[in-house]
């Protein structure tokens, strides 16, 4: 679901097997793996997350995902506009 007020996306992803090609967006993305696994490539670094793992993908960073077996994850995407508006002083804000 996407909040009309904040544009923050919070949803459960159930994936039977897919590939999302390299892309980027102006949102911080947090993925918490509940079941299965997910292969993630962030810029040139690839890794796999498993149940109980959580990863944060920064805004404006090229990334892709590949699901090779069924999985279930909780996904939170927080737009930079929201963070800049409601969090006045971000530590390391120039790095986001």
Locate each region found by the language model.
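Generic protein-terminus/edge-of-domain signal
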Residues: 1-50, 54, 88-95
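Conserved metal-binding segment of the jelly-roll/cupin
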Residues: 49-62, 68
């Amino acid at each position: 679901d996407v909040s009309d007020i904040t544009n923050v996306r919070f949803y459960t992803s159930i994936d039977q097997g897919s590939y999302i090609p390299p892309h980027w967006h102006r949102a911080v993305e947090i993925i918490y793996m509940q079941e299965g696994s997910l292969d993630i490539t962030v810029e040139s670094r690839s890794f796999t997350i498993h149940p109980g793992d959580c990863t944060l993908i920064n805004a404006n960073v090229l990334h892709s995902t590949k699901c090779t077996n069924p999985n279930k994850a909780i996904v939170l995407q927080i737009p930079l506009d929201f963070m800049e508006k409601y969090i006045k002083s971000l530590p390391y804000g120039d790095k986001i």
